[in-house]
Design a protein with these regions (language model features):
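PAPS-dependent sulfotransferase catalytic domain
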Residues: 1-129
Length: 129
C-alpha cells in the first residue's frame, strides 16, 4: 500500500510527511527513502521527502510496483487528484492523508519565505509577492 501525504505549499506538508512516514515506519512500514533506492525510483520520488510531483498514471504505476510486491510506504505530493490516483484509491492500493492550512496564513508564510530567499540572494517562486 502507498500512503500519499498531500498538502498545499507552505502548509507544513514536509512536517506532515515526516510525521506520517515515522508513524508508518513505527507500525512496520518501509522507509520510502529505502524503497526509492531499492527500486531505482530516484527520478520519480525526488527531494528529501520522496515527492512524486504530478500524480500521473506513469509515475503512480512506477511507485505501485513496490506496493504490489508487499511494501507499504509513504510518498508526498502537492498536486490535486487525478484519474489514476482515484483509481488506485478505489482499489485500496493508495490511501491519502491531507494537511490543510488557512490560506491567509499560508500566504504570509510564502511571503516570508520569499523575502528570506531574496535577502540571501536566491529568489524563488514566492519572492515576487
Amino acid at each position: 500500500m502507498i500512503v500519499l501525504s498531500v498538502g498545499m505549499p507552505r502548509a507544513g506538508s514536509g512536517w506532515h510527511y515526516n510525521l506520517i512516514n515515522d508513524l508508518m515506519m513505527a507500525s512496520g512500514a518501509a522507509d520510502a527513502r529505502v524503497i526509492r533506492e531499492k527500486y531505482k525510483l530516484q527520478k520519480i520520488l525526488t527531494e528529501v521527502n520522496c515527492n512524486i510531483s504530478v500524480l500521473s498514471a506513469r509515475r503512480l504505476g512506477m511507485v505501485s510496483i513496490p506496493a504490489l510486491l508487499g511494501n507499504t510506504f509513504v510518498i508526498k505530493a502537492h498536486s490535486s487528484p487525478t484519474t489514476a490516483s482515484r483509481f488506485l484509491t478505489s482499489l485500496g492500493l493508495l490511501r491519502v492523508t491531507y494537511i490543510y492550512r488557512d490560506p491567509r496564513d499560508a500566504m504570509l508564510s510564502a511571503y516570508d519565505y520569499g523575502q528570506r530567499a531574496l535577502a540571501k540572494g536566491r529568489p524563488n517562486a514566492f519572492s515576487h509577492l
